[in-house]
Amino acid sequence: MSRSHSVRDSDAIKALEDRRYRAMLAGDTAVLDELCSDNLIYTHSKADHDDKASYLRKVGTRYFTYLEITHPADRILVVGGAALVTGRMTAKVLVEGTIVHVDNRYLAVWVREHGAWKFVAYQPTPIINS
């Protein structure tokens, strides 16, 4: 892959990550459905995990409601048909009526499926005593 393709792909992934987080804040399951791979593995900071259907159901039913999110990416690495995004995500989330403050380092994985980038995995690691 040429450097210009890599830069274009990195820019595309950055835009998709921004769109994904906006959809999370808005509770927009239509956009999340479009962005997520059918093979999604979404791990949460307390180690529970969802597949695509259960994640969209939780967002759609407001099981958790994202109130605030910051998500600066430290690095976007495009390797073949995959893109790895690392960074720090902080959030204020309403989970079953309780406000939860989240502060994680994360790895988000995007893959090319049928010519389009799809969000396939998320793995956070809580930052202790931040």
Predicted regions and their residues:
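A beta-strand edge to alpha-helix "cap/lid" segment located at domain peripheries
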Residues: 2-35, 39-130
